[in-house]
Amino acid sequence: MNTIQVIIFAVVLVLTVTVGQADEDSAETSLLRKLKEAEASLFGQHLEESQHSREKRCLGENVPCDKDRPNCCSRYECLEPTGYGWWYASYYCYKKRSG
């Protein structure tokens, strides 16, 4: 009789633990879903835009560039050097002129 009680107790204990974990997992999942919804409502589209709006790798100032495919940063433009750099026969990234 004692062994049957021990077996029943063990089965009840195992069921209690597994059901309790299932409840914790579902509560955690629902909390995560609520947090994602709150984040989406607070920040909206701004997060998605800023995530993809970062400028890709680009060249800085006074760096050689290809005039056919310039990959200078947005505030620079690919121009033929003037003055001291004319003998290099290459284009360089220079700050855009205002005006």
UniProtKB/Swiss-Prot annotation:
- Principal location: secreted
According to the UniProt record, list the residues that bear Serine amide: 98
Q: Describe, from its UniProt entry, the tissues in which this protein is expressed.
A: Expressed by the venom gland.
Q: Which domain of life is it from?
A: Eukaryota
Q: In this UniProt entry, which cysteines form S-S bonds?
A: 58-73, 65-78, 72-93
Q: Record's family?
A: Belongs to the neurotoxin 14 (magi-1) family. 08 (Ltx-4) subfamily.
Q: How is this protein named in the record?
A: U1-theraphotoxin-Tal1a
